Amino acid sequence: MNQATQDFIRQHQDDDVRQLAFLGSKYPEVDMPFALDQIRGRKMARVKLPRWASLEGIIYPPHISMEQCSSESTALYKAELAARLLDLPASSSGIEMKAENEIEFVDLTGGFGVDFSYIAARLGVKSMYVERQAHLCEAAKENFERLGLKNAIVKNGDGIEVLHSFLPKKDDAASTDDSLGITYDQPLSLLKTKLGLKLIFIDPARRDDAGNKVVSLKDCTPDVTVLQEEMLSKADYVIIKLSPMLDWHRAISELSHVREVHIISVNNECKELLLVLSARNLGDMEASSADGEVKHAGNLRIYCVNDAQSFVCDELDMESSPVKIAPSTLEEMQYLYEPNASLMKAGCFGVLSDRYDARMLSKNSHLFVSQAPIEAFPGRSFRIIAISSFNKKELKRHLSGITKANIATRNFPLSVAELRKRLKLKDGGETYIFATTLSDES
């Protein structure tokens, strides 16, 4: 990047990139496409990656990579997850390891490097970032230096071929095939780890060659269903990052040794699905329920996270906790609850009902009610001020004086738009209306 481009970026960092795009002929010495990427990227980073945005000299990728990269909050979550898996104390982070230490963490699909940077900094172990696109590797080298990562190795190459280069955890052989078509920044011997990796992170692409989104785990690139056994033979843990649109039940049926499912939401919008795999004997991997009781060590555990809220249950909980259905009269019910997006995705409604002593309005409503207020319910809570049938006169009486409301439908024959039109209400205000079908189909 020449000085003219640097000056242009600094002088126009708050300007509209759509207007700046017309100034190319006025600034022939400026690398305009690159400059616009930097200005646009830093604006996005102020919201998505505030720590990165606060640093001078961070290089941002083209717009699509910025849209697809993790946010700071989700990257921090993954970093803490990795630290827990590796049994690191809560206070340890960013420990610079000696050069002779073997690689313990590898990100096989580095991308913009957000997840890698936070995980590597938290673990403090020698870590490798692998990415096929050279321009992302160049940006990663610059950015990791500015972020103070002293333990990062950047590799421009194919993640699968790099995976093949690592020895299995129990293989003490001293030699492997050096005839790989990859140029490494460090001697290939660094890959000949005898003890095996501690952690592999992989984020397979969820689009096909035509750019269309795929819904099956096997259609992602690389295909982790094919790679899983090799990854598990070479690392204690594997974290797979997936689209929240994927069916996690189907995904775990296509994989072996899935130990944890993490459904991560930000501002009640489901952002990521993480699967933790391990072939280790995980009898010591215990998680506490809401009341502090350790349950079903070693069983598949589901983490439903929305910002600071976290709800943990496991497969046995889900199998042994039928949903409690509310009586259709609802006369004594005073409070209504809407589970957050992660819980909706997880579908652990029986556990939710049992743990908080709440009743679901009907099997398919996914709305809960209770007589007494429930503190710290993982979702939105409302005080019920009126319950009405869909009778026109009854609705008119309850809606008297209300001109606008926030409307949601659950298991209801009309859409929100249709219901709003029928009720003649504007959007917004402090009133919330939930339209649903009760257990008696009323």
Where are these regions (language model features)?
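SAM-dependent transferase fold signal centered on methyltransferase-like domains
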Residues: M1-S442
